[in-house]
From Swiss-Prot:
The keyword Membrane applies. GO terms for cellular component: apical plasma membrane; plasma membrane; protein-containing complex. The chain crosses the membrane at residues 94-114, 124-144, 167-187, 209-229, 258-278, 301-321, 339-359. Residues 1-21 form the signal peptide. This is Proteinase-activated receptor 3. Receptor for activated thrombin coupled to G proteins that stimulate phosphoinositide hydrolysis. Belongs to the G-protein coupled receptor 1 family. The gene is F2rl2. A proteolytic cleavage generates a new N-terminus that functions as a tethered ligand. It comes from Rattus norvegicus (Rat). PROSITE patterns: G_PROTEIN_RECEP_F1_2. Interacts with INSC/inscuteable and GPSM2. Pfam families: 7tm_1. Residues 115-123, 188-208, 279-300, 360-368 are cytoplasmic. The record marks 37-38 as: Cleavage.
Protein backbone atom coordinates (compact mmCIF):
# COMPACT_ATOMS: atom_id res chain seq x y z
CA UNK A 1 0.00 0.00 0.00
CA UNK A 2 2.76 2.44 0.94
CA UNK A 3 4.62 1.60 -2.27
CA UNK A 4 1.56 2.49 -4.36
CA UNK A 5 1.24 5.83 -2.58
CA UNK A 6 4.89 6.72 -3.28
CA UNK A 7 4.49 5.79 -6.96
CA UNK A 8 1.39 7.97 -7.29
CA UNK A 9 3.16 10.94 -5.63
CA UNK A 10 6.17 10.57 -7.94
CA UNK A 11 3.97 10.50 -11.05
CA UNK A 12 2.11 13.57 -9.82
CA UNK A 13 5.36 15.51 -9.32
CA UNK A 14 6.68 14.43 -12.69
CA UNK A 15 3.69 15.88 -14.51
CA UNK A 16 3.44 19.03 -12.36
CA UNK A 17 1.98 21.90 -14.45
CA UNK A 18 4.54 24.29 -15.87
CA UNK A 19 2.48 27.26 -14.68
CA UNK A 20 3.62 26.61 -11.13
CA UNK A 21 7.29 26.76 -12.17
CA UNK A 22 6.69 29.86 -14.26
CA UNK A 23 5.02 31.67 -11.38
CA UNK A 24 7.92 30.76 -9.13
CA UNK A 25 10.41 32.14 -11.64
CA UNK A 26 8.39 35.34 -11.91
CA UNK A 27 8.40 35.68 -8.11
CA UNK A 28 12.21 35.40 -7.99
CA UNK A 29 12.57 37.94 -10.79
CA UNK A 30 10.37 40.43 -8.99
CA UNK A 31 12.46 40.23 -5.82
CA UNK A 32 15.84 40.93 -7.43
CA UNK A 33 15.69 44.71 -7.19
CA UNK A 34 19.08 45.14 -5.49
CA UNK A 35 22.15 43.70 -7.13
CA UNK A 36 25.16 42.59 -5.14
CA UNK A 37 28.15 43.91 -7.01
CA UNK A 38 31.41 45.40 -5.87
CA UNK A 39 34.00 48.05 -6.44
CA UNK A 40 35.50 45.40 -8.70
CA UNK A 41 32.55 44.45 -10.89
CA UNK A 42 30.33 45.30 -13.83
CA UNK A 43 26.71 44.76 -14.78
CA UNK A 44 27.48 42.01 -17.32
CA UNK A 45 29.78 39.89 -15.16
CA UNK A 46 27.51 39.36 -12.14
CA UNK A 47 24.30 37.48 -11.51
CA UNK A 48 21.58 39.50 -9.85
CA UNK A 49 20.03 38.25 -6.62
CA UNK A 50 18.30 39.94 -3.67
CA UNK A 51 20.64 40.95 -0.85
CA UNK A 52 18.00 39.85 1.65
CA UNK A 53 18.52 36.26 0.49
CA UNK A 54 22.14 36.25 1.65
CA UNK A 55 22.27 34.48 4.99
CA UNK A 56 24.11 36.57 7.55
CA UNK A 57 24.66 39.48 5.13
CA UNK A 58 26.17 42.41 7.03
CA UNK A 59 26.81 44.94 4.31
CA UNK A 60 30.05 43.53 2.96
CA UNK A 61 30.02 43.47 -0.81
CA UNK A 62 29.70 39.96 -2.24
CA UNK A 63 30.01 39.09 -5.91
CA UNK A 64 29.16 36.12 -8.09
CA UNK A 65 31.34 35.84 -11.15
CA UNK A 66 29.94 34.94 -14.55
CA UNK A 67 31.26 35.03 -18.07
CA UNK A 68 32.80 38.37 -19.09
CA UNK A 69 31.51 40.10 -22.22
CA UNK A 70 33.72 40.41 -25.26
CA UNK A 71 33.18 44.15 -25.69
CA UNK A 72 34.80 46.81 -23.50
CA UNK A 73 32.69 48.01 -20.58
CA UNK A 74 32.43 51.71 -19.71
CA UNK A 75 29.22 51.71 -17.65
CA UNK A 76 28.87 49.81 -14.36
CA UNK A 77 26.24 49.08 -11.73
CA UNK A 78 27.21 49.09 -8.03
CA UNK A 79 25.42 48.12 -4.85
CA UNK A 80 23.96 50.36 -2.14
CA UNK A 81 27.06 50.09 0.08
CA UNK A 82 29.25 51.47 -2.69
CA UNK A 83 26.81 54.27 -3.48
CA UNK A 84 26.64 55.07 0.23
CA UNK A 85 30.39 55.60 0.33
CA UNK A 86 30.46 57.67 -2.86
CA UNK A 87 27.77 59.97 -1.45
CA UNK A 88 29.07 60.09 2.14
CA UNK A 89 30.48 63.21 3.81
CA UNK A 90 33.66 61.23 4.48
CA UNK A 91 34.31 60.97 0.76
CA UNK A 92 32.99 64.38 -0.28
CA UNK A 93 34.17 66.52 2.65
CA UNK A 94 36.75 64.91 4.97
CA UNK A 95 39.03 63.36 2.33
CA UNK A 96 39.19 66.50 0.13
CA UNK A 97 39.85 68.59 3.25
CA UNK A 98 42.94 66.47 3.98
CA UNK A 99 44.07 66.78 0.36
CA UNK A 100 43.67 70.57 0.51
CA UNK A 101 45.85 70.63 3.65
CA UNK A 102 48.51 68.50 1.94
CA UNK A 103 48.46 70.73 -1.15
CA UNK A 104 48.65 74.01 0.80
CA UNK A 105 51.58 72.80 2.94
CA UNK A 106 53.29 70.38 0.56
CA UNK A 107 53.72 72.61 -2.50
CA UNK A 108 55.50 75.56 -0.82
CA UNK A 109 57.44 73.29 1.56
CA UNK A 110 58.88 71.20 -1.28
CA UNK A 111 59.59 74.28 -3.41
CA UNK A 112 61.55 75.79 -0.51
CA UNK A 113 63.37 72.47 -0.07
CA UNK A 114 64.41 72.42 -3.74
CA UNK A 115 65.51 76.05 -3.50
CA UNK A 116 67.64 75.29 -0.44
CA UNK A 117 69.11 72.21 -2.11
CA UNK A 118 70.05 74.16 -5.25
CA UNK A 119 72.42 76.37 -3.26
CA UNK A 120 73.81 73.65 -1.00
CA UNK A 121 77.40 72.54 -1.59
CA UNK A 122 77.93 70.23 1.42
CA UNK A 123 77.08 66.51 1.35
CA UNK A 124 76.27 65.67 -2.26
CA UNK A 125 74.51 62.47 -1.13
CA UNK A 126 72.05 64.41 1.02
CA UNK A 127 71.38 66.78 -1.88
CA UNK A 128 70.72 63.97 -4.36
CA UNK A 129 68.42 61.99 -2.07
CA UNK A 130 66.31 64.93 -0.94
CA UNK A 131 66.16 66.46 -4.42
CA UNK A 132 64.63 63.23 -5.74
CA UNK A 133 62.29 63.04 -2.75
CA UNK A 134 61.15 66.66 -3.17
CA UNK A 135 60.58 66.19 -6.92
CA UNK A 136 58.44 63.09 -6.27
CA UNK A 137 56.42 64.95 -3.62
CA UNK A 138 55.97 68.01 -5.83
CA UNK A 139 54.83 65.93 -8.81
CA UNK A 140 52.25 64.32 -6.56
CA UNK A 141 51.09 67.62 -5.05
CA UNK A 142 50.44 69.27 -8.42
CA UNK A 143 47.94 66.50 -9.25
CA UNK A 144 46.04 66.94 -5.98
CA UNK A 145 43.73 69.74 -7.26
CA UNK A 146 42.19 67.20 -9.64
CA UNK A 147 41.51 64.77 -6.77
CA UNK A 148 40.17 67.60 -4.61
CA UNK A 149 37.77 68.72 -7.34
CA UNK A 150 36.74 65.10 -7.91
CA UNK A 151 35.72 64.52 -4.28
CA UNK A 152 34.11 67.94 -3.81
CA UNK A 153 32.10 67.28 -6.98
CA UNK A 154 30.49 64.24 -5.37
CA UNK A 155 33.10 61.79 -6.71
CA UNK A 156 32.22 62.74 -10.27
CA UNK A 157 35.36 62.77 -12.47
CA UNK A 158 35.22 65.29 -15.33
CA UNK A 159 38.86 65.42 -16.44
CA UNK A 160 38.95 62.39 -18.73
CA UNK A 161 40.56 58.95 -18.71
CA UNK A 162 44.15 60.12 -19.31
CA UNK A 163 44.16 62.54 -16.38
CA UNK A 164 42.57 59.88 -14.19
CA UNK A 165 45.42 57.51 -14.94
CA UNK A 166 47.99 60.27 -14.35
CA UNK A 167 46.62 61.09 -10.89
CA UNK A 168 46.39 57.39 -9.97
CA UNK A 169 49.99 56.76 -11.04
CA UNK A 170 51.11 59.91 -9.18
CA UNK A 171 49.39 58.69 -6.02
CA UNK A 172 50.93 55.25 -5.87
CA UNK A 173 54.18 56.31 -7.52
CA UNK A 174 54.84 59.01 -4.93
CA UNK A 175 54.20 56.67 -2.02
CA UNK A 176 56.52 53.90 -3.20
CA UNK A 177 59.15 56.32 -4.48
CA UNK A 178 59.24 58.00 -1.06
CA UNK A 179 59.46 54.64 0.72
CA UNK A 180 62.36 53.43 -1.42
CA UNK A 181 64.28 56.73 -1.24
CA UNK A 182 63.93 56.84 2.55
CA UNK A 183 65.22 53.26 2.62
CA UNK A 184 68.19 54.20 0.43
CA UNK A 185 68.94 57.09 2.78
CA UNK A 186 68.94 54.67 5.69
CA UNK A 187 71.33 52.32 3.87
CA UNK A 188 73.60 55.25 3.04
CA UNK A 189 73.72 56.50 6.64
CA UNK A 190 74.18 52.93 7.90
CA UNK A 191 77.23 52.38 5.68
CA UNK A 192 78.69 55.79 6.54
CA UNK A 193 78.40 55.24 10.31
CA UNK A 194 78.65 51.47 10.88
CA UNK A 195 81.04 50.62 8.01
CA UNK A 196 82.97 53.87 7.45
CA UNK A 197 85.97 52.24 5.75
CA UNK A 198 83.79 50.49 3.19
CA UNK A 199 81.81 53.68 2.66
CA UNK A 200 84.93 55.75 1.99
CA UNK A 201 85.91 53.43 -0.86
CA UNK A 202 82.57 53.95 -2.62
CA UNK A 203 82.16 56.62 -5.33
CA UNK A 204 79.58 58.46 -3.23
CA UNK A 205 78.05 60.64 -5.93
CA UNK A 206 77.75 57.88 -8.52
CA UNK A 207 76.61 55.36 -5.92
CA UNK A 208 73.83 57.69 -4.74
CA UNK A 209 72.78 58.52 -8.30
CA UNK A 210 72.66 54.79 -9.08
CA UNK A 211 70.44 54.09 -6.08
CA UNK A 212 68.01 56.87 -7.01
CA UNK A 213 68.02 55.76 -10.65
CA UNK A 214 67.14 52.20 -9.67
CA UNK A 215 64.31 53.53 -7.49
CA UNK A 216 62.77 55.52 -10.34
CA UNK A 217 63.06 52.61 -12.78
CA UNK A 218 61.39 50.23 -10.29
CA UNK A 219 58.57 52.69 -9.60
CA UNK A 220 57.95 53.38 -13.30
CA UNK A 221 57.85 49.66 -14.12
CA UNK A 222 55.48 48.91 -11.24
CA UNK A 223 53.18 51.80 -12.22
CA UNK A 224 52.78 50.59 -15.83
CA UNK A 225 49.67 48.44 -15.10
CA UNK A 226 47.95 51.42 -13.46
CA UNK A 227 48.85 53.56 -16.48
CA UNK A 228 47.61 50.96 -18.98
CA UNK A 229 44.41 49.65 -17.36
CA UNK A 230 41.19 51.64 -17.51
CA UNK A 231 40.54 53.68 -14.35
CA UNK A 232 37.46 55.72 -15.29
CA UNK A 233 33.95 54.20 -15.22
CA UNK A 234 30.49 55.71 -15.41
CA UNK A 235 27.97 54.49 -12.82
CA UNK A 236 24.32 54.22 -13.84
CA UNK A 237 23.43 54.90 -10.23
CA UNK A 238 24.07 57.52 -8.86
CA UNK A 239 24.87 58.86 -12.34
CA UNK A 240 28.53 59.82 -11.82
CA UNK A 241 31.89 58.95 -13.37
CA UNK A 242 34.44 57.54 -10.91
CA UNK A 243 38.22 57.54 -11.06
CA UNK A 244 39.99 54.49 -9.55
CA UNK A 245 37.14 53.95 -7.05
CA UNK A 246 35.41 51.27 -9.14
CA UNK A 247 37.03 48.52 -11.18
CA UNK A 248 35.90 46.06 -13.81
CA UNK A 249 37.16 42.55 -13.07
CA UNK A 250 36.98 41.71 -16.77
CA UNK A 251 39.36 44.57 -17.56
CA UNK A 252 41.67 43.65 -14.66
CA UNK A 253 41.11 39.98 -13.62
CA UNK A 254 41.08 39.05 -9.94
CA UNK A 255 44.27 36.92 -9.96
CA UNK A 256 46.22 39.77 -11.57
CA UNK A 257 44.86 42.35 -9.12
CA UNK A 258 45.71 40.12 -6.17
CA UNK A 259 49.28 39.28 -7.17
CA UNK A 260 50.01 42.78 -8.46
CA UNK A 261 48.92 44.72 -5.39
CA UNK A 262 50.25 42.18 -2.89
CA UNK A 263 53.66 42.16 -4.59
CA UNK A 264 53.54 45.96 -4.71
CA UNK A 265 52.96 46.13 -0.95
CA UNK A 266 55.51 43.40 -0.23
CA UNK A 267 58.40 44.71 -2.33
CA UNK A 268 57.41 48.37 -2.12
CA UNK A 269 56.76 48.55 1.62
CA UNK A 270 57.37 45.47 3.80
CA UNK A 271 60.94 44.72 2.68
CA UNK A 272 62.01 48.42 2.62
CA UNK A 273 60.41 48.93 6.03
CA UNK A 274 62.36 46.03 7.59
CA UNK A 275 65.58 47.29 5.99
CA UNK A 276 64.95 50.85 7.21
CA UNK A 277 64.20 49.75 10.78
CA UNK A 278 67.38 47.65 10.82
CA UNK A 279 69.56 50.45 9.43
CA UNK A 280 68.26 53.23 11.66
CA UNK A 281 68.12 51.20 14.89
CA UNK A 282 71.66 49.91 14.28
CA UNK A 283 72.72 53.49 13.64
CA UNK A 284 71.27 54.66 16.96
CA UNK A 285 72.95 51.81 18.87
CA UNK A 286 76.27 52.55 17.19
CA UNK A 287 76.27 56.19 18.18
CA UNK A 288 77.16 57.22 21.70
CA UNK A 289 74.41 58.96 23.63
CA UNK A 290 76.89 61.70 24.46
CA UNK A 291 77.63 62.32 20.79
CA UNK A 292 76.50 65.75 19.64
CA UNK A 293 74.63 64.33 16.63
CA UNK A 294 72.92 61.53 18.58
CA UNK A 295 69.85 63.60 19.56
CA UNK A 296 69.33 64.84 16.01
CA UNK A 297 69.55 61.30 14.69
CA UNK A 298 66.92 60.30 17.23
CA UNK A 299 64.63 63.06 15.91
CA UNK A 300 65.27 62.03 12.31
CA UNK A 301 64.62 58.35 13.03
CA UNK A 302 61.43 59.15 14.95
CA UNK A 303 60.16 61.29 12.07
CA UNK A 304 60.95 58.53 9.56
CA UNK A 305 59.13 55.99 11.75
CA UNK A 306 56.15 58.37 11.98
CA UNK A 307 56.09 58.68 8.19
CA UNK A 308 56.23 54.90 7.80
CA UNK A 309 53.69 54.21 10.56
CA UNK A 310 51.07 56.84 9.71
CA UNK A 311 51.50 57.31 5.98
CA UNK A 312 52.68 53.98 4.60
CA UNK A 313 51.89 51.12 6.99
CA UNK A 314 48.06 51.41 7.14
CA UNK A 315 47.75 51.74 3.36
CA UNK A 316 49.88 48.72 2.53
CA UNK A 317 48.64 46.45 5.32
CA UNK A 318 45.00 47.11 4.44
CA UNK A 319 45.92 46.75 0.75
CA UNK A 320 47.18 43.20 1.35
CA UNK A 321 44.22 42.23 3.56
CA UNK A 322 41.68 43.79 1.19
CA UNK A 323 42.90 42.01 -1.93
CA UNK A 324 43.42 38.71 -0.08
CA UNK A 325 39.91 39.00 1.37
CA UNK A 326 38.44 39.78 -2.04
CA UNK A 327 40.44 37.10 -3.85
CA UNK A 328 39.73 34.26 -1.40
CA UNK A 329 36.39 35.28 0.20
CA UNK A 330 34.90 37.36 -2.64
CA UNK A 331 34.17 40.37 -0.38
CA UNK A 332 35.59 43.88 -0.39
CA UNK A 333 34.27 45.32 2.88
CA UNK A 334 37.71 46.83 3.69
CA UNK A 335 37.83 49.03 0.61
CA UNK A 336 36.42 52.03 2.50
CA UNK A 337 39.20 51.75 5.08
CA UNK A 338 41.77 51.38 2.33
CA UNK A 339 40.70 54.63 0.64
CA UNK A 340 40.95 56.45 3.98
CA UNK A 341 44.42 54.99 4.58
CA UNK A 342 45.45 56.03 1.06
CA UNK A 343 44.35 59.55 1.90
CA UNK A 344 46.49 59.56 5.06
CA UNK A 345 49.40 58.30 2.96
CA UNK A 346 49.47 61.62 1.14
CA UNK A 347 50.66 63.33 4.34
CA UNK A 348 54.22 62.17 3.63
CA UNK A 349 54.51 65.01 1.09
CA UNK A 350 54.18 67.46 3.99
CA UNK A 351 56.52 65.62 6.35
CA UNK A 352 59.42 64.92 3.97
CA UNK A 353 60.62 68.57 3.85
CA UNK A 354 60.90 68.62 7.65
CA UNK A 355 63.05 65.50 7.44
CA UNK A 356 65.41 67.36 5.09
CA UNK A 357 65.89 70.20 7.56
CA UNK A 358 66.70 67.76 10.37
CA UNK A 359 69.15 65.76 8.25
CA UNK A 360 70.81 68.93 6.94
CA UNK A 361 71.47 70.02 10.53
CA UNK A 362 73.12 66.66 11.22
CA UNK A 363 75.38 66.99 8.18
CA UNK A 364 76.24 70.57 9.07
CA UNK A 365 77.32 69.42 12.53
CA UNK A 366 79.50 66.70 11.04
CA UNK A 367 81.25 69.08 8.65
CA UNK A 368 81.58 72.06 11.00
Amino acid sequence: MEMKVLILVGVRLLFLPTTVCQSGMKHVSDNSALTAESFNGNEHSFEEFPLSDIEGWTGATTTIKAKCPEESITTLHVNNATMGYLRSSLSTKVIPAIYILVFVIGVPANIVTLWKLSSRTKSICLVIFHTNLAIADLLFCVTLPFKIAYHLNGNDWVFGEVMCRVTTVAFYGNMYCAILILTCMGINRYLATVHPFTYRKLPKRNFTLLMCGVVWVMVVLYMLPLAILKQEYHLVQPGITTCHDVHDTCESPLPFQFYYFVSLAFFGFLIPFVVSVFCYTTLIHKLNAQDRKWLRYIKAVLLILVIFTICFAPTNIILIIHHANYYYSNTDSLYFMYLIALCLGSLNSCLDPFLYFIMSKIVDQLTS
